[in-house]
Amino acid sequence: MSTLKQRKEDFVTGLNGGSITEINAVTSIALVTYISWNLLKNSNLMPPGISSVQYIIDFALNWVALLLSITIYASEPYLLNTLILLPCLLAFIYGKFTSSSKPSNPIYNKKKMITQRFQLEKKPYITAYRGGMLILTAIAILAVDFPIFPRRFAKVETWGTSLMDLGVGSFVFSNGIVSSRALLKNLSLKSKPSFLKNAFNALKSGGTLLFLGLLRLFFVKNLEYQEHVTEYGVHWNFFITLSLLPLVLTFIDPVTRMVPRCSIAIFISCIYEWLLLKDDRTLNFLILADRNCFFSANREGIFSFLGYCSIFLWGQNTGFYLLGNKPTLNNLYKPSTQDVVAASKKSSTWDYWTSVTPLSGLCIWSTIFLVISQLVFQYHPYSVSRRFANLPYTLWVITYNLLFLTGYCLTDKIFGNSSEYYKVAECLESINSNGLFLFLLANVSTGLVNMSMVTIDSSPLKSFLVLLAYCSFIAVISVFLYRKRIFIKL
């Protein structure tokens, strides 16, 4: 048993990752499938309402296509994108020429804002973005244990970029976007919860995740399950990181009334990077030190937590200009529900440029981060490190998510999707509705599969069939819960 455990640990150890260009190409399949689904939906060929045909198409696009992108077609992402997009585009053209009916929301038509008062809206492109990320994450956490999953996509040892490294940061970034909804809701209701109430809510939400993290630790240590110590440490894991984020950020909340969250995120990143770079002793400790005490044993989880705090804060900042139904005053960098028109008499040029629509905000911040990240990649003495969540890593994660969100937002603009004309594939909607629970289910299922078979010795065909069955299981559970209106909050 110990020999097999060692083989499995060696299978995911000492890896160097791949290029950012390839990662972008492979993960772009999620955006391409969203575009393809919209093409089919607007072609007048897809059956209306919920049908078995529609669900099969949905599952094929949003689960099978993503599975193919990181297994069989891992080396041919552009070919896979073409094979998916081209038939859907032809179906769209054919449907437009042969159908006499017109869609209720003609694409390319801009819709006027009906509601004047600030409201939080459910945006199709955010659901699609987060759903695609959750599905890809769920697939990858099991696929990484099979030879069919390229080693360059698995988490790197220390320096480098990989698909799974990006997935961890993207999960935190998207959670930041989701958490900004509560901040905007309190602001719109003119509610100011006390520090103690915020701390209690953070403990309540984080406590469940901490319990799951400790439960995972117990099973890993007692069931001879493979572990990668340099990932987070001896006792630490991703659930523990997620559990501590709400509580730690509760202590930052009072400061955010005077200082924007993006400024705090910049401060955290700069101070942390200074600690890493000021002399060699810090990095030597992180890479080479013995694991002879709790702090040293879990140094990756403890130090990288600072980087994840920064990513989470940038996710919150992004939510401020994405989630509302209209531009609000200075929403580019702070939570706001104040109407720009109402404040126009005393607003300045700065107010004009920082009160933005979702697409404008994404374009502005994407451009800023793209320029800064390229400069840092060029002149920084060290490469990206998910292990330490250093500055290059946080910049990479934030830039990627902003750029891809821009792509999703543009897709909605082109196809006329909005909160009034909400069109999102059921697979994406359902996994969003119970995201954290399904992430936990995916982790548990991954453990069960690993204990029931020797994944590293599986043939390509067997690997793919097992992964397809796993995808079907998670997808069916998610849709079942969604149709029954069962929403499990952890």
From Swiss-Prot:
Q: Which residues lie on this side of the membrane: Lumenal?
A: 1-19, 76, 150-157, 221-231, 279-301, 378-390, 457-460
How this chain sits in the membrane, per its record, is:
Multi-pass membrane protein
Q: What results from changing residue 259 to D?
A: In gwt1-28; temperature sensitive mutant that induces a delay in export of GPI-anchored proteins
What does the miscellaneous comment read?
Target of the antifungal compound 1-[4-butylbenzyl]isoquinoline that inhibits cell wall localization of GPI-anchored mannoproteins.
One Pfam family matching this protein: GWT1
The role this protein plays is:
Probable acetyltransferase, which acetylates the inositol ring of phosphatidylinositol during biosynthesis of GPI-anchor. Acetylation during GPI-anchor biosynthesis is not essential for the subsequent mannosylation and is usually removed soon after the attachment of GPIs to proteins.
Q: What is the effect of changing residue 209 to P?
A: In gwt1-28; temperature sensitive mutant that induces a delay in export of GPI-anchored proteins
Q: Which family does it belong to?
A: Belongs to the PIGW family.
Question: TM segments?
Answer: 20-40, 55-75, 77-97, 129-149, 158-178, 200-220, 232-252, 258-278, 302-322, 357-377, 391-411, 436-456, 461-481
Protein's name according to its UniProt entry: GPI-anchored wall transfer protein 1
